[in-house]
UniProtKB/Swiss-Prot annotation:
<feature type="transmembrane region" description="Helical; Name=3">
    <location>
        <begin position="85"/>
        <end position="105"/>
    </location>
</feature>
<feature type="transmembrane region" description="Helical; Name=1">
    <location>
        <begin position="20"/>
        <end position="40"/>
    </location>
</feature>
<feature type="topological domain" description="Cytoplasmic">
    <location>
        <begin position="41"/>
        <end position="53"/>
    </location>
</feature>
<feature type="topological domain" description="Extracellular">
    <location>
        <begin position="1"/>
        <end position="19"/>
    </location>
</feature>
<feature type="compositionally biased region" description="Basic and acidic residues">
    <location>
        <begin position="210"/>
        <end position="222"/>
    </location>
</feature>
<dbReference type="GO" id="GO:0007186">
    <property type="term" value="P:G protein-coupled receptor signaling pathway"/>
</dbReference>
<keyword id="KW-0675">Receptor</keyword>
<dbReference type="InterPro" id="IPR000832">
    <property type="entry name" value="GPCR_2_secretin-like"/>
</dbReference>
<feature type="region of interest" description="Disordered">
    <location>
        <begin position="210"/>
        <end position="242"/>
    </location>
</feature>
<comment type="similarity">
    <text>Belongs to the G-protein coupled receptor 2 family. Adhesion G-protein coupled receptor (ADGR) subfamily.</text>
</comment>
<keyword id="KW-0297">G-protein coupled receptor</keyword>
<keyword id="KW-1133">Transmembrane helix</keyword>
<dbReference type="GO" id="GO:0098978">
    <property type="term" value="C:glutamatergic synapse"/>
</dbReference>
<feature type="transmembrane region" description="Helical; Name=7">
    <location>
        <begin position="285"/>
        <end position="305"/>
    </location>
</feature>
<feature type="topological domain" description="Extracellular">
    <location>
        <begin position="75"/>
        <end position="84"/>
    </location>
</feature>
<dbReference type="InterPro" id="IPR017981">
    <property type="entry name" value="GPCR_2-like_7TM"/>
</dbReference>
<feature type="transmembrane region" description="Helical; Name=4">
    <location>
        <begin position="135"/>
        <end position="155"/>
    </location>
</feature>
């Protein structure tokens, strides 16, 4: 054994690659797998076109196949048949991945340059649904033909070129025409699509989102009450396109940047991986680290752009998580936990805040309040509950609100919390106030009650012909004690605050009733749950000699 053989270093990569290659490849595979599974499981809930979903799924699959075979078999030179198979798979998957990126660029360009349909009132869609087989024939068939011709010409074109080659790939001369030439053409055509899309977006700044054409029947159903509940001259709620008509949540500019950056990351990762297994002992470590950095960047970019930056994907992810148990369950009037959790229901995205029943009076009995059908009494946070309304009867206590016009629609929830020391008063102009009838609810035996389950605060705000009742609970400094018969205490009062800039938009029919709580300057609470002393003297509404409560402009009385 001569000195040269003793001092010579083993040829790289040897039996194993640098550890950073395996670690970073595993991270990228996890990111691609998460994106792939998300778009497979929740394909009906994610707003993306059919072409975009297929191109993304195929890109994730072929990119994962490319780097998995690279990390696991690029240095298996001791097994000739396995080495040839690794070279064939790398050849096919690399060209297929680049072609799927090119198909993505082509689809973006077609969407940007697509003209608006001439007729929207026909039952047939203006653009027929085209099959996706052509994309699979191009992105999967072309690489298959190239690999088949190369292998049929000479199977030894794959594998190790000679004994000194330490990686499984292709011979140099066949690779020029079978791989590097087609890869360069694909990259050039893809860049031309990118440039054309960029020019079109600069010339037409208004083309920002990919919209989905809706049939006439769906457009009529999307209009509130078939187009009858909209006031004439009412401006649209917002200028941006609605979520129901978006074909893709990302804009064209975001899709263009993502496709271009994906092509750059994939090309750079592949190049650094090839240099990591073909260079000397020191450069292999440098290029292995560069390969790992770009590999992780590619996986994280795909996961962040296509999943983490999309609201619909986040909704799908949260829907898969088990719901948390309420740490503070709602209690009824007797202190028992309520079995019904439907009171914590909140309106979903795009749903009107109201009930689909004809306009009519709404009533709430004490029995329903005690059973938990009327309000939510969560001691932690206020909640907004939906209550079913029934026709008004003459022998039951109720809260009757009669309006002359239609309610204005407000898609946002009202703020429920108000200050204790500054209770809101009626500030609506008398000329704008419709006629309201407020009746103090009574118990089942006819005696008035002061519990907050008897007369919950409510807020009415919804489209025409609908009512929305939201209970807004606050910390009550008074104990929940039923008022005995013959007591001279008065039940709690409610007020209607107004918010600047909202009264004109909501219309005269808007009424928001909140519980009025005050400090106790005249003494502590009595046994009936109300403060002692002459606290009622400072209230805007007093009582007459017969014990009736006068409620200001309503002039309705309830005899105790």
């Amino acid at each position: 054994m001569d000195l040269k053989t003793v001092l010579s270093l083993p040829r790289y990569p040897g039996e194993f690659l640098h550890p950073v290659v395996y670690a970073c490849t595993a991270v990228m595979l996890l990111c691609l797998l998460a994106s792939f599974v998300t778009y497979i499981v929740h394909q009906s809930a994610i707003r993306i076109s059919r072409k975009g979903r297929h191109t993304l799924l195929n890109f994730c699959f072929h990119a994962a196949l490319t780097f998995t075979v690279f990390a696991g078999g690029i240095n298996r030179t001791k097994y000739p048949i396995l080495c040839q198979a690794v070279g064939i798979v790398l050849h096919y998957s690399t060209l297929s991945t680049m072609l799927w990126i090119g198909v993505t660029a082509r689809n973006i360009y077609k969407q940007v340059t697509k003209k608006a349909p001439l007729c929207l009132d026909t039952d047939q869609p203006p653009y027929p649904r085209q099959p996706l087989l052509r994309f699979y024939l191009v992105s999967g068939g072309v690489p298959f033909i190239i690999c088949g011709v190369t292998a049929a010409t000479n199977i030894r074109n794959y594998g190790t070129e000679d004994e000194d080659t330490a990686y499984c790939w292709m011979a140099w001369e066949p690779s020029l025409g079978a791989f590097y030439g087609p890869a360069a053409i694909i990259t050039l055509v893809t860049c031309v699509y990118f440039l054309g899309t960029y020019v079109q977006l600069r010339r037409h700044p208004g083309r920002r989102y990919e919209l989905r054409t809706q049939p006439e029947e769906q457009r009529r159903l999307a209009t509130p009450e078939g187009g009858r509940g909209i006031r004439p001259g009412t401006p649209p709620a917002h200028d941006a396109p609605g979520a129901s008509v978006l074909q893709n949540e990302h804009s064209f500019q975001a899709q263009l940047r993502a496709a271009a950056f994906t092509l750059f990351l994939f090309t750079a990762t592949w190049a650094f991986g090839a240099l990591a297994v073909s260079q000397g002992h020191f450069l292999d470590m440098v290029f292995s680290c560069l390969y790992g950095a770009f590999c992780v960047t590619l996986g994280l970019f795909v996961l962040i752009h296509h999943c983490a930056k999309r609201e619909d994907v986040w909704q799908c992810w949260w829907a898969c998580c088990p719901p948390r148990k309420d740490a503070h369950p709602a209690l009824d009037a007797n202190g028992a936990a309520l079995g019904r959790a439907a009171c914590l229901h909140s309106p979903g995205l795009g749903q009107p805040r109201g009930f689909a029943h004809p306009p009519g009076p709404c009533k709430m009995t004490n029995l329903q309040a005690a059973q938990g059908h009327a309000s939510c009494l969560s001691p932690a946070t206020p909640c907004c509950a939906k209550m079913h309304c029934e026709p008004l009867t003459a022998d039951e206590a109720h809260v009757h609100l009669q309006e002359e016009g239609a309610f204005g629609h407000d898609p946002h929830l009202h703020g429920c919390l108000q200050g204790r020391t500054k209770p809101p008063y009626f500030s609506r102009h008398p000329a704008e106030e419709p006629e309201y009838a407020y009746h103090i609810p009574s118990s089942l035996d006819g005696s008035p009650r002061s519990s907050r389950t008897d007369s919950p605060p409510s807020s009415l705000d919804g489209p025409a012909g609908t009512h929305t009742l939201a209970c807004c609970t606050q910390g009550d400094p008074f104990p929940m004690v039923t008022q005995p018969e013959g007591s001279d205490g008065s039940p709690a009062l409610y007020s209607c605050p107004t918010q600047p800039g909202r009264e004109a938009a909501l219309g005269p029919g808007h009424l928001e009733m909140l519980r009025r709580t005050q400090s106790l300057p005249f003494g502590g609470p009595s046994q009936n749950g109300l403060p002692k002393g002459k606290l009622l003297e400072g209230l805007p509404f007093g009582t007459d000699g017969t014990g009736n409560i006068r409620t200001g402009p309503w002039k309705n009385e309830t005899t105790v």
